[in-house]
Amino acid sequence: MLAKRIIPCLDVTGGRVVKGVNFLELRDAGDPVEIAARYNAQGADELTFLDITATSDGRDLILPIIEAVASQVFIPLTVGGGVRTVADVRRLLNAGADKTSFNSAAIADPQVINDASQKYGSQCIVVAIDAKRRSPEEAATRGAGWDVYSHGGRKNTGLDAVEWATEMVRRGAGEILLTSMDRDGTKSGFDLALTRAVSDAVNVPVIASGGVGSLDDLADGIQTGGADAVLAASIFHYGEHTVGEAKARMAARGIPVRT
């Protein structure tokens, strides 16, 4: 079995790292460059940087901050938020990103995933999916499952999350970053049923995101959810745990990690 990755996530707005609950109630967590350097030193396998209001605000990519973060980080860096075009991929790669993450733009124009992966290779094209479990009323008419939300979780697209992940991989996505909006920031653990459903449906790595409150939650995402990597923010940002502690817990549970 390949080593499983632990990926701290920097949600950035206004040039600061923030963390919310269910995509709302944002709380300041610090300077992105300082935090990125800390995770690099702690032995994180990768880092994900998401400009969480770029799309909803209609803003351009914040290249100076991305360049500053990339200069401090010597592990793979994924950048998302406001990535709209194939040209944006080139700009981010030039700024120091290793992978770029599409979300709302892929929903508006799925062909961008074909075009970007053909030009730069699927290994650097990630599709982020923000998914929310259907309400009992919706499930009664459409069946149980999860819908895809766009614009920072503000808009229900009506797309089924598992079907959307499958289509994105078919179009060339090399990785799926799967966030449970229901669990985001709640510290109640991943939505393991969602993680498992998508992991079983696609043949590329799935990164589980949304809800980590303990080190065992990370291991559960791999062992029960079937994820290839686990992403967390709150438990790392506020000093509750280090990446090293997370790797030690995963190793103790029999999960291969990079040491």
Swiss-Prot record:
Its EC number is 4.3.2.10. It holds the Pfam family His_biosynth. InterPro entries: Aldolase_TIM, His_biosynth, HisF, IGPS_HisA/HisF, RibuloseP-bd_barrel. Gene3D superfamilies: Aldolase class I. It is found in: Cytoplasm. This is Imidazole glycerol phosphate synthase subunit HisF. The active site is at residues 11, 130. GO terms for cellular component: cytoplasm. Heterodimer of HisH and HisF. It is an enzyme of class 4 (lyase). The keyword Amino-acid biosynthesis applies.
